[in-house]
């Protein structure tokens, strides 16, 4: 469909990438100037491939493309397979929750409203070719094609156990926890460098985990009538 649209005057293609592309990177915060050549999961590899395909379309057909690397999105209408949804459901059903790596990990949790706000603002920031860019000296987030990549994250990594504490406060009960080893393909920490995003659109995600988790629990209880 993208190839078809390329012949129909597409002004700007925005697409969802992921913080997962940073894979084995250890330098914090994760920067779009850093290489992302070592994914640790198939999901991460597909997101990297997504960015490569976008760049190819930008180069071949001149389609302006912007990749947005989302960092651990959560909030109302979230995916049922994500931790917050599964934890909330289990707690309200009186079941234990599975806590991986014994809770010793951090995530840059980003509330859905902040993600949407950033996307809306990015629509009008149409990337232009950078004539000074070279493979040898240029940033991976930039190109001689009309192509850009940005992080969208809260820039405040939170310990998983603190995230669970915020959920316990919102639900009004203490979770029974199954402490388990880390899952294959998981990483210990994520943290977003959002300065390029702020420079482009004057916005940084700012919803706190405590407020965002409460919003989710309020929605969950109302939607599922529990």
Where would I find each of the regions flagged by the language model?
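Active-site proximal helix/loop that lines the substrate pocket
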Residues: 18-21, 72-78, 104, 157
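C-terminal substrate-binding subdomain of Rossmann-fold SDR/epimerase-dehydratase oxidoreductases
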Residues: 91-226
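Short-chain dehydrogenase/reductase
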Residues: 40-51, 78-85, 108-109, 157
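Aromatic/hydrophobic pocket-lining residues that form π-stacking "cages" and hydrophobic walls in ligand
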Residues: 1, 54, 86-87, 164
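N-terminal Rossmann-like NAD(P)+-binding domain of SDR-like oxidoreductases, especially those catalyzing
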Residues: 1-73, 122-123, 203, 207, ...
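Short aromatic-enriched loop/helix-cap "lid" or pocket-rim segments at secondary-structure transitions
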Residues: 26-28, 78-81, 112, 163-164
